[in-house]
């Protein structure tokens, strides 16, 4: 089903969504979802919100593919096989070892908190692989948004546009009591996903967003990461 066939028959009224401040402060990366799918009418509302994201010169370069149902289950099986075989086909390189200084510390702190919540010790390689592979079951989310983009120059500005679109998408989910998680790991299999979905080669996969109704009992949702004080990242010039 293509999105132009989805018509919203009952939009969420403004008083049914969180305030802006509540939305910003309650949004989190959800790593465990209930298996009941989000109605297509609500998915359309979220997509319409995301369409208002800013972009360089109003290019609106995002190309979003929503995958669910049997199609998503088929893709999950393929990605698990590819992951186990180490057959990665990313459009953009990514290596966590490139992080340094405070960025590395924050990355490591997240990993430690997550694996502890999942009751997996650092030396448990099999357990860590199993937990990492949950990315390719989409944390049990019944639907996933794959965010593709055209390639222009060094792609930095286009990727920035996609990031703003993704953030708007995530905030719209949060405002409705839904959850999502942006997954760089899905981009590791860009060519595989592109071929499976029939996406043209000129569109590059930056990341995907698994989303749905949060499962608050899931171990991956039992921890929270803090934010550094504003003064550590902002300089005022007066």
Regions from the language model: what does each represent?
Residues 1-238:
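Acidic, surface-exposed loops and disordered segments
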């Amino acid at each position: 089903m293509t999105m132009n066939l989805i018509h919203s028959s009952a939009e969420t009224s403004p008083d049914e969504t969180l305030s802006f401040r509540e939305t910003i402060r309650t949004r989190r990366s959800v790593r465990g979802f209930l298996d009941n799918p989000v109605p297509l009418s609500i998915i359309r509302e979220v997509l319409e919100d995301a369409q208002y994201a800013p972009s360089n010169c109003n290019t609106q370069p995002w190309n979003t593919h929503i995958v669910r149902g049997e199609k998503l289950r088929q893709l999950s099986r393929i990605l698990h096989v590819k992951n186990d075989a180490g057959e990665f086909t990313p459009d953009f390189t990514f290596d966590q070892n490139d992080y340094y200084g405070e960025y590395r510390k924050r990355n490591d702190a997240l990993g430690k908190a997550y694996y502890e919540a999942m009751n997996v010790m650092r030396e448990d390689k099999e357990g860590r692989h199993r937990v990492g592979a949950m990315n390719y079951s989409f944390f049990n989310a019944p639907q996933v948004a794959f965010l593709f983009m055209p390639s222009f120059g060094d792609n930095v500005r286009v990727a920035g546009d996609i990031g703003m679109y993704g953030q708007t998408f995530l905030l719209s989910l949060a405002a409705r009591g839904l959850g999502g998680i942006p997954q760089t790991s899905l981009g590791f299999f860009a060519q595989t996903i592109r071929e499976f979905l029939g996406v043209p080669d000129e569109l590059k996969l930056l990341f995907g967003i698994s989303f749905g109704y949060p499962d608050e009992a899931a171990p991956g949702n039992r921890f929270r990461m803090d934010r550094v004080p504003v003064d550590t990242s902002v300089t005022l010039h007066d």
